[in-house]
Amino acid sequence: MKATKGGPWFYLIILLGSLKIDCRPRKKKEKKEFKFDTCNQTTCQELGKRLSDTINNSITPCNNFYEHVCNTWNKLNSKGRSKYMHRVDIRKLLHGLLEKSTIKKDAEIQATDMVKIAYKSCIKKKGKYKKEPEVIKNLLKGHGIKSWPLQPGTSSRNYLSVLNSTGLYPFLNVEVKRTKSSPSRNTLEVSAASPHVLPWTDWQGHGISKKKREKIKKAYKKLIKNVIKLLHPNRTNKKKIAASIMNFEESLAKLDEMWFKRIAGFWTEPTLHIKEMKNHLSKKFPIFLLLSNQFKKVNITLKSNQKVTVQNRYHVNAILECIQKTDSNLLQNYMGWMLILDYIKTAGGKLQEHWKTFKKEAKFSPEEQKEWKELCLDALVTEETTMYAPAANLYLEKYFPPIEKERAFLMISFIVEALANLIEKNDWMERKVINKAVDRLREVKYRIGYDDFFVNMTYLNTLYTFVDKENVTPQTPFITIHSMLRRNLELKRMQSLQTNEEEFDYRFGPFFTQGYYDSTSNTLIYQAASIQGIFSEEQLPKSYLYGGLGSKIAYQIARTVETMDITTTNSGVPGNVYVWSGIMAKNYLEAAKCLQKANRKAKDDKTPKIRFSSYVASTLARQAYVEAIKEDKGDYVLPGDQSIDSEQLFYYSYGQLHCRGAGYSYTVTESEERLNFLMKLDQIFMDTFSCPKYVHKLEAPGDDCTIIPEKQKKKRKPKKDTSLKLAAIGAVVQQILENNLTALLDSDIEVLDIIKV
């Protein structure tokens, strides 16, 4: 066809003629040059030695990667393996910080000063101190007990007068907790306290015979008598008073069986307006009156429509009935004794000596034997948390610089983006499922290193507004400081009923040494102690970090976005399926040549069934690693004679996560099967170690890799007159939702250790 003046070719020639075309040869785009310098720091030298000690080069990675990286490792005993594991001894670090700390004499006392003083007071007051009886009496007065003990049976007061002065503890706990129906508000919750030292209801469970039981009770009665004598040497009937306290404690403790046996009944955990609740308590117990007086101590006026929940109402009512029919002097004696027991472990002085004598004579210790300084740390930080936040502040300042938190977040951001890209750029999921998966990924919260308030001294000081700071001195007996701190914590929690401030769960604070996904709050947690020192080394190869820690974080993030009851296109998984079912069908099954179908033909096949989160962990971590070295335009390599390039180090770090005792809970056999199978499906691994192309052993002629679609169940028509049943079911479902069982169903929590640098 000839181009005419009015034809399309004519206009094309005119257009080309009008363009300025540069015919000079184009310069090639300069590639970003990545530097891979050798890391000569001590940490890298130790890591290089570890790999040379544990990698077995007589077994090729292509034949058996697990044996290649774990054969030598697995032969080590637990002590030998522990030197390669990342372990932070928080207790040792805290002892060092608190023992060597100094306090500025002229400056205003801060929260961190208080934990230093309290710790040193505890260590110092292990022995005797002056005016011990007066110190203990003042402690009891602080809890509303003006005189202890009293003669039973001579009371001129009723039980309400006693409880109005002392509060409900140690009979009942009154706590401020989050409202289940409204996660941003607080409410009141009442439950049985049961602070008993002896196993009154479970002697047999502790392997205690009847003969030994009587010996323990005799020694316990003597302990009470000795404490009475310490406070009131001239008090008559000490033995009788001690016996009455012990017998009442035993009878009250036996009510705990109602809790352990979970006595069933209608409305066991009612939630009502506090003024109405008395109608459902024993003899219309005036709980509104008593709690109103208690909350006045923090300037809160309880309203009659304040909601309160009673946990196990039958148990609580049994305790209230016992209170109402008991002599008020005996009630006060019991309450005073329980309070003394609360402080006796670290009381020091003669009180501590009497406690030791009891344990020696009874040959029974209610708790694990510990050094004195360990008991002091427990009382302030690790068991009780009255001084957790200031201690954490000191630890973070010394051992966890902000750069570690920043680098950890950077790693996570790379992994999250890699996973988001994987979700969005696929052809095996429906668009609505993609959107839901991405939304779920974006909703995950991260607590990395520490919560910011731990490094805010102004905020930390507000946590101790009810402490008489002038009385917190090295000369103050620890039992006095301890009681002030406990009382302060109690009052601050009461105050939160009005402020709606959420109680911090210190179990997952900076001292938490494990990586953890909390399904209840949809939060991935890697606190300071779990990653301390890992990101602080400037030259530590990123291939090592991302292959090990990065793979574990990638696994846990992939697990967080798995969710039940989402259907995907061409899903071959019966029943409820995970959001990743389509991914598994497209990738996992395709790579394994329709493993589901093949397994139906070969039921004896031992190929491990691997969930997508495990399958994709190393892939996501590697993509994140690539982004990390782009960010820094390079990485470091290890020193040594053995040549280990960056890609190989990544897979070595990942592979050794599967070694014995290195973190995963699989058996050696399971770990070997899983790791080898995963690596055979990883094309980059195969290329890195020059392995031959993998052909699945179950591949057979005729397999067409057809995914069998899920058969939908027919919906049953509801029967007539089922309104009452449906209402009951609705109530049960509501309870299930409130107890967050849905989150538990899709949690599959795994706690993973970190291999040491």
PLM feature spans:
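Intrinsically disordered, low-complexity linker/terminal regions across diverse proteins
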Residues: 33-35, 245, 251, 271-283, ...
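Extracellular/periplasmic catalytic domains that process cell-envelope and extracellular macromolecules
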Residues: 57-61, 181, 516-520
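Noncatalytic, helix-rich "gating/capping" subdomain that lines the substrate-entry/channel surface
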Residues: 93-415, 451-454, 463, 467-475
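Solvent-exposed, acidic/flexible segments
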Residues: 55-62, 83, 87, 91, ...
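Hydrophobic/aromatic-rich, well-ordered segments within soluble, folded domains that form packed cores
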Residues: 54-75, 203, 207-229, 431, ...
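Cleavable N-terminal signal peptides of Sec/SRP-targeted secreted and luminal proteins
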Residues: 5-20
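Signal-peptide-cleavage-adjacent N-terminal segments of secreted and extracellular proteins
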Residues: 23-92, 757
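Short, solvent-exposed loop/turn elements at domain surfaces
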Residues: 73-77, 197-199, 534
